[in-house]
Amino acid sequence: DCLLSRGLGDVYKRQPVYYELETNNGNRDYRIQIGGHYMNYNTVYVGMDVHKESFTLCSCKYEDEKASHYQRTPASYKNVLRYLAFLRTIYGEDTRFVCGYEAGCLGYSLYHQLENFNVECVILAPTTMLEQRSKRRIKTDKRDAEIIARSLAQHNYSPVHIPTETDNQTKEFIRMRDDHKAELKKIKQQILSFCLRQGYQYDGSGNWTAKHVKWLRSLKPAGLYKEILDEYLLTYTILTDKLNRLDQRIEELASKEEYTESVSKLTCFLGIKTHTALSVIVEVGDFQRFVSARKFAGYLGLVPGQHSSGDDRNGLGITKAGNTHVRRLLVESAQSYTRGKIGYKSRVLRSRQAGNSPQVINYADTVSYTHLRAHETRGNL
């Protein structure tokens, strides 16, 4: 009755169906099915607002209006286990517990620690949860934990995909390489700015070519300025050599049995090389969870937003929700279509496509042709 009074039957447009189940110890458990979702009366949902130093925990059942049993503990999975043991003294040993926390600084570590003790755990994607944080005027750890618990209970969230250990290690390695790439970009900017402040300007065709680097090494600014430039160039050389070594290691990782076929297929596309292909594979994981390309684009935050009301239609830029790393790589890859030529494939692209099936190559070429024609008629992508 309490469920019907809350209007859930109207929301799902279906008549609720009740089940009475018998548990292992003879107790009775009740479950309701509405719109394909099974709500277990004997399930307790534990919301965890997790930080580096502390966890804020609370619990609620599906039929509860508010969460209860709030507790703030030091950041440790052992304290979560103690909290669950405390809840069992209240709800009984047969109670099913589902814990959840937002994707954030802890990554997958807390999830795996709890799973090792057979504790059911979910990582929630923040942008898909019941209540948008930006709309709230009061934000506390206690309220955050309650929102997580209620989202778990009412199934108003999307879970984060949990990668395999191999995928996660490969993902972290690639991100580490990209961090060094960002450092190299920064040191390049610092070198150019330093030279400009000292009155040196390169009049060649482009920066960071072999001729440009040779010109930088030939400069002889006065006094301590020479030592400063030498230190900058030393850092540049170290980072360049390290990136070459890391890129070679990524090539080795991509040649593993679990990755080689998928990487080979993805590199058939214009603008996608081994680094981007392997990043997409290990970051996304299971592509089968996306029923369409539109859903995948939404996951990456590449679909346009909208702020409309009544007859007013106001289109926004891309939502930028989801995986920032993959979105940046694919946006960079898309720039290749602004420079490609219709009907022409470079020697490098032909070498990447070599050895793949004709169906894969034809599909990649068709996609490239479509986008190149679109660029030809509409300008920049």
Predicted regions and their residues:
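Glycine-rich, often acidic, oxyanion-interacting loops/wings at catalytic, nucleic-acid
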Residues: D178-V263
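Phosphate-backbone recognition surface of nucleic-acid-processing proteins
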Residues: K265-C268, T274, S279-S368
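Single conserved hydrophobic/aromatic residue that forms the stacking wall/gate
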Residues: D1-Q15, H371-L381
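Nucleic-acid-processing active sites and adjacent nucleic-acid-binding tracks
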Residues: D64-D94
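Short alpha-helix plus adjacent loop in nuclease-associated cores
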Residues: L124-P159, D312-K320
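Intrinsically disordered, low-complexity and often Lys/Arg-enriched segments
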Residues: D10-N42
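Gly/Thr-rich phosphate-binding beta-strand-loop-beta motif of the actin/hexokinase/Hsp70
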Residues: N40-K61, I148
